Each structure stands twice: as structure tokens, then as C-alpha cells.
Amino acid sequence: MREKDLIKLEFDKVKEVLASYAHSPATKEKIQNLKPYTNKEKVKEEIELSKAFFDIAENVRLFEFEDIRELLKKAKLQGAILGVEDILKILNVINLTKEIRRVLSSHVQRLEPLRKVYKKLYTFSPLENLIIGSIDPRGFVKDEASEELLRVRKSIRAVEEEIKKRLDNLINRPDSAKFLSDRIVTIRNGRYVIPVKTSHVKKIFGIVHGTSSSGYTTYVEPQFVIHLNNKLTELKQKEEEEVRKVLQRITEYIGDYAKELLESFEACVEVDFQQCKYRFSKLVEGSFPDFGEWVELYEARHPVLVLVKEDVVPVGILLKEKKGLILTGPNTGGKTVALKTLGLSVLMFQSAIPVPASPNSKLPLFEKVFTDIGDEQSIEQNLSTFSAHVKNMAEFLPKSDENTLVLIDELGAGTDPIEGSALGIGILEYLKKKKAWVFVTTHHTPIKLYSTNSDYYTPASVLFDRETLKPLYKIAYNTVGESMAFYIAQKYGIPSEVIEIAKRHVGEFGEQYIKAMEKLSDYVKKYEEEFRKLEELRKELQKEKEEVEKLRKEYEEAKRKGWKEAYKEAREYLRKLVQESEEIFKKAKEKKEIKEFVSKKREEIENLAPQKPQKLEVGDLVEFMGKKGKVLEVKGNKALVLVDHLRMWLDTRELQKVGKAEPQKETKVTVQTPVMEKRDTLNLIGKDVETAVRELEKFIEEAYSAGYKVVKVIHGIGSGKLKSAVREALSKNEKVKFFRDAYPKEGGSGVTVVYLEYGEET
């Protein structure tokens, strides 16, 4: 398909909205490169995948992830070393892969299309453990990453302590105030120095490492710590070398897993893409049409208009029995919008993007879509405008065939009306010969009359309210619309004398034509109103049908849960039975105790055994799994029982008759469901470090016990002391999987998002 046709139909704007929901630059790139498929099976496959994902979309929790494709290429190179930030980007994708795999694992059996994505979601436990064991969430390579690194860092700390100790002895001498500008130890050029008054710099033997901007202070490395600073420098270099070795080892692992990581990353992008489509569908209330022999687009709304307006009037666009549609009617009546709605809906459908139209809609597959649409409707159209339209049509007319959709706005405009009409009819005849699908709009009467006698084109018109001079944005089929030039002119104050003169120039035939159009338009409006009422009735029936289906599913689920609970109780009883047996046999001193115990338990077990079918009647009160119910119907060994507002067919051997039900007065009961309070956020602003850390540990313990997987800690920005204390405490907490700065929409750097090791995400 031509790029300019996609742009004319505003397909790029739909993709912009889709991309705004993406969690990764790679997903945005995928959306930007998206084009309609021209293979029917491919469209079906993509739609089935989207439908399957939409079924579980609310369970999927995605987070931001980077494009790691170039990093994986680099990791495969001999001797390559990835930086800490790059490795953490890959770890982030591993974590996302694990989360998506967890959600999909319980649905792939039920939703077959998800299996293709699920198979690409690998597990990376060895690599994940290596990264987590070597690098902390802040991007710091841990001491434990290697034995040599641990030894070197211990040496570094020992040397640093010795240097500080010696310098502290100097700056804390009583006479030091005479030559020091401040009693502190600082670092310049990677070496420990002290700030000396420039005027007294000669009193300290050592190396000068610079002066302050004011010149008042000179930073001096005393001679007695030079050898220690040298040793520290050597150790720092060894530390860097060890860190490089750690990163290189991790990079080699990543290179070994590059193929699987790439496939998992692509699966993450696919899931992100599907979630973008799901959120877009919710925004526009979209659905997927089915494939059909004809164009049947019901209650369609222009997708771009839906995004910027709330009160978009739906329209039905039908090409049934005939492959062509000629739409007429006044300006601002919605002709161009209807034309674009069909075109854009086709592009979206063949891209597997939900269309804002009724799910009952159907569309054929189009291999090509050609457009001739002017973005600006001008009162004065010149030859250059006409030439541009002709040039465009000359390009696509020869390429049109039976699988082509041609959309032409204002056919025949831009030149002499008589010649323009004749040329327009010629184009329509040519496209008919090509068996193309055609949707055109026009004002020209000869083309209107042509459509009424055509076996290929259906005439249609947009409806207009004469009283308010407002379009109704509805299409009436098998009728032609008047341009209403005289009526609109009169309403807006053109003198009646002018209107009468104009009508005389139209001629007797033209006047009869106008009156016929007015009468036909009134009839169509009445027809549309009746059709609207029927459509509302159909919707109500559909809604009731969906409600019945929902209740049926709820009943089946409740019944399934009931059996599951019964099975759970039985297992628990048997577990306790075994436990009691072990305790009795252990403690029993006499054979009598054992006999009594065995006799008692045998009696209990016999009570659990299946009973003979009971003779039950309608109205009997029975007991089932400790709950009372009422018999509504009996068929052989089966009884329909009402238990806790649920109707269930049960085996009569599972029921215990407890009496006859007494007639009860109808009682209305209002049930209020308590709202469970969720505590997934901790605010530490204003707390001192000690109190904050104590509350944080308690909060993490409670959140972990409550089953949360993600929680938030608000610490603010401030001096950064509280945030550092929070991060340090989190890094030591075994229940914390990892943590990160909140995204701007979550609170930014003043909030830390914490992922717990177990539990379920809120």
C-alpha cells in the first residue's frame, strides 16, 4: 500500500496513540513500522493472538525496559565487556520475562495463541543469580563478586583508615589551627590531602595538589602519607582490574545466552505491543470485525475523532450486493468523514488493531487501498487542484483490481461541472470494469442520476435537518441527497427574489427533481428513526443475553470452587487423622487405648463413606458439606438443591435429609461487602533515620506477609540521607528482590519502588 494513502487516512495518528502506551523504545519502533497485512491468514493469526491476550491483559503488569538488541550483539564479541548499567538493563528484561512467563503459564493451555509467545520466554536462573550476586541494584559491583576483589577492597579500607588516622592526628594537634584553613581530610586527584592556608603552605612538607578558587587554601599531601597514597593508588588499580574481570565474566555468560535472551526480549516486546492494543481498545471501545463477503461496518466511528471528541455519532457503512457506493448530500454532512472512516477501519482491521465499530461488523480483505482525498474543502477550486487529483488517479486507476478499495472524495470537482460529471462517470465505469470496490462522494447531479440506474453502484445520502441546518451524520441507502444550496441560502438570509430567480434558471425538470429529493429525504428520516428503535431493541436483547451467560459462568465457577474446597477439607481431615494416629501410637501404653482409638476412627471413616441414595422430595431440607439447602427438583439419584443462593445438581448420596422446609415470607436482604484496606505505600518523610529504618523493616515484613509483590516507600529528596538509609536497609533485607527509583508518574526520585521476593502484585 502507498505510504501517502496511509497518511491521507490518518493511520499514522492511530499509531502515535498506540505508541504512547509502550514501555520500551523497541515497542514504539515496532508500532511505527506497522503496516496493514494483505494475507488473510496472517490477519487472522494476529487477531487471534490479540483476542487471547485481551482475555488476560488485566493480569499482566509491565514495567519500563530498554532495547537490549545491540548489547546482545556486543556481548557475543570476543573480549567484550558490558558496563554495569548495560548489564542491569539485561537483568531488567530477565525479570520482565520471568513475570510475563508466570502470568502466561496458567493460561497457555486454555488460550492456544499465547503458546507461540510463551515458548520464547526462557528461564535464566544461572545468569540471573550471577548478576544479582555480583552487582547490587544501585549498580555497585559487590565485594563478594570474587575472592580477589574482596581481598583488595579489604586492603583498600585498611590503607584508607591508616591514612585518615595519620592525617587526623595532624589536623587535631592544638597548633594546627595556625596553618590549616579547615580541620578536615579531603581528596584531590584521588589522593588524601589536607587544606592548608596558602600563607603557611611552607610549614607542611609534602606535595601540592592545587588551590581553592579564592586562592586562600592550598591542598597538600603531607610527606608521611605519600607512600600510603601510592599504595592506595595501586590497590585502586587492582580493584578496577578485578571489577573488569567480574564484568567480563558476566558478559561472557550473556553472550552464551544471547540467542535465548533475544527471543525473550522479542516476546516481551510482543506482549507490550499487545497491551498497547488492549489499552487503545479500551480507549476507543474497539472490537475486531470478522471477515465477510461484503462491507458491513455497523456503528462505526472515525478512530481519530473518537480520540479528540466524546460525542462522535456512529454511522453504518454498507457495500452489500453491490461493490460500489456513491454518497451524496450537503457540505458538512459527514460524507468525507464516512469515507475516511471506512478507509481507516480497513487499515486498522488488517493491522489487527481494534476498530471502533460494532463487533457484528464484517470486512473483506483488500490487497490495495487507493485514495483521492482533499484535506481542504475550498470554495474556489482551480485547475492546478484539478490537475493534482487527475494525476493521482492516473497513477492508481490502472493498478486497481477486484481486491482493491478505491476512495474518492468529491468526484468530478475542480473543473466545469458538466465535464467533471462526465469524467467522473467515466472513472466509475472504468472501476466497474476492473471489479474494484469503490466509495465516492459527489455533489454533481449527473453522477447522482447515474447511481440510481447502476447495477454496480448503490446510491446513498447523508441526512440533514432542515430546521436546525445541522447534519445528522447518518447515511440513508438507495436514495440520493440534495445539496440543499437554495434552502441553506434562504435560511441564512439570501433575499427570496434571488432564490426565485435561481430556481427559474434550474428549469422545470430541475425543480421537480429538487421537490422529489425533499420528499424522499423526509421519508428516509422516518425510516432511519424506526431503524434506530429496532437497533436499540437489539442491543437490549444482546445485553440480556450477555447477562445470562455471565450468570451461568459465575454459577459454574462457584460450583467448581465448592468442590475444590470440599477436596481441600477432606485432605486436611486425612492429614489430621494420620497425625493423631502417630501421636496415639507413640503415647499409648496399653492395647486398650489403641483398640478404642481404632474403633472410633473406623466409625468416623465409615460415616465418610458414600451413602445409599436417599428418597428425597421437593421441599425437603438437606445438608451438604455442612451447609443447609432446599430441594427444588428430583430426577433419579440427582437432586437440584439451592445452597447459599446457588442452584446445584447433586448426588442424593451426598445429601443428608434434615427436615421439611417451612414457607417463609420473602425478605429483602442488603449485603454490604467490606472494603479490605490495602497498605502498599509507606511515607517516611519527616522521620529520623533510625525511626525510618525501623518502620521500613516492619512495613516490609507486613507487606511480605500480606502477599504484596510491589510496594512503594516515600522518602523525599532532601539531603539524600534518608533515601540512602532506606536503600541500604532494603539491600540488606532478604525479602527484597530488587528496587528502583519511581518513574515520574509514580513520584520520581523521591519514591523508591520495591519488589518483594514472594507474594502477588497489587
Swiss-Prot record:
Gene3D superfamilies: 3.30.1370.110, P-loop containing nucleotide triphosphate hydrolases. One of its GO terms (molecular function) is endonuclease activity. InterPro entries: DNA_mismatch_repair_MutS_C (IPR000432), DNA_mismatch_repair_MutS_core (IPR007696), DNA_mismatch_repair_MutS_sf (IPR036187), MutS (IPR045076), MutS2 (IPR005747), P-loop_NTPase (IPR027417), Smr_dom (IPR002625), Smr_dom_sf (IPR036063). It holds the Pfam family Smr. GO terms for biological process: mismatch repair; negative regulation of DNA recombination; rescue of stalled ribosome. It comes from the Bacteria. Disulfide bonds: none annotated. Endonuclease that is involved in the suppression of homologous recombination and thus may have a key role in the control of bacterial genetic diversity. Acts as a ribosome collision sensor, splitting the ribosome into its 2 subunits. Detects stalled/collided 70S ribosomes which it binds and splits by an ATP-hydrolysis driven conformational change. Acts upstream of the ribosome quality control system (RQC), a ribosome-associated complex that mediates the extraction of incompletely synthesized nascent chains from stalled ribosomes and their subsequent degradation. Probably generates substrates for RQC. This is Endonuclease MutS2.
